Design a protein with these regions (language model features):
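Nucleotide-state-sensitive switch-loop elements of NTP-binding domains
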Residues: 2-20, 24-139, 144
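C-terminal accessory "lid"/substrate-recognition subdomains
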Residues: 2-3, 148, 155, 164-244
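Short glycine-centered, acidic/aromatic-flanked micro-motifs in structured strand/loop junctions
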Residues: 16, 99, 159-160, 236
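Conserved beta-strand/loop subsegment of P-loop NTPase cores
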Residues: 39-40, 94-96, 120-132, 150-161, ...
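Short, conserved catalytic or adaptor-binding loops enriched in Gly and charged residues
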Residues: 55-56, 64, 149, 176-178
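A broadly conserved amphipathic alpha-helix scaffold signal in soluble, globular proteins
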Residues: 106, 110-113, 154, 174-177
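Short histidine/acidic/glycine/proline-rich micro-motifs that form metal-
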Residues: 136, 162-163
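Flexible active-site lid/hinge loop adjacent to a nucleotide/diphosphate
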Residues: 137-152, 158
């Protein structure tokens, strides 16, 4: 079958603020016995791929992009990597893009509409946002990215439910609904949601996104990095004493 006759490859964008549990969810997707194979693109803020080190040794291909958000300087790399993956599309059933916790997901999603080759070969299946139920109020207060991650979500995994009371959980859901009244919310502890709840959902709704961001398809975005967030990375050849 020719490339033009093939069905588009479904893409899941996995996002969530730092520490919310998105890498734990990715590990679940990669290791459960569901019979599917995924190509995984992991973006990490900083030069060292910390998240890639946390991903378990699964029989998947991991493409890691460092030193810049997918939504900014790495967008070109994302298009290049996706184009390269299409040459090996018979080796996987879907693509998962795990963004850095500092990313606004809107420009990531734009990638699948502004590049003609990527648009033909792929289909954005869902934006899945993992939310830390315990710390969400603080994140909403100090991070515009955390709000955008919720606003653009098709599916929200409300994680770390074991750390909050029912009253606190209800208040968190109320805060989420004020930002995004449409997304499906799945409560979880340690990101323990069924894989079928986040993969193969055909949940991305372009019309809803255009209502929020009329210029979404223009390929232009006002996203800026948080200037207060920086990363410093270094490698050592011996254990570090955290008390010194």
């Amino acid at each position: 079958m020719s490339d033009t006759a093939r069905a588009p490859v479904p893409v899941t964008v996995l996002t969530g603020y730092l520490g919310a549990g998105k890498t734990t969810l990715l590990n679940r997707i990669l290791t459960e016995n569901h019979g599917q194979k995924f190509a995984v693109v992991i973006n990490e803020f900083g030069e060292l791929g910390v998240d890639n080190d946390l991903v378990v040794d699964a029989d998947e291909e991991v493409f890691e992009m460092n030193n810049g958000c997918i939504c900014c300087t790495v967008r070109g790399d994302l298009i290049r990597i996706l184009s390269g993956l299409m040459k090996r599309r018979d080796k996987f059933d879907g693509i998962i893009v795990e963004t850095t916790g500092l990313a606004d997901p809107a420009p990531v999603a734009q990638t699948f509409f502004v590049d003609d080759d990527v648009k033909r070969a792929t289909k954005l299946d869902a934006i899945v946002t993992v939310v830390d139920a315990k710390h969400l109020p603080a994140r909403l207060a100090d991070s515009a990215e955390a709000q955008e991650q919720i606003a653009f979500a098709d599916i929200i995994v409300l994680n770390k439910m074991d750390l909050v009371s029912e009253a606190e959980a209800a208040e968190v859901e109320k805060r989420i609904r004020a930002i995004n009244p449409y997304a499906e919310i799945r409560r979880a502890t340690k990101s323990d949601v069924p894989i079928s709840a986040v993969i193969g959902r055909d949940a991305f709704n372009l019309e809803r996104i255009l209502e929020r961001e009329p210029e979404f398809l223009s390929g232009e975005d006002d996203h800026e990095h948080d200037s207060e967030v920086n990363s410093v990375s270094f490698e050592v050849d011996r254990p570090i004493d955290a008390e010194r």
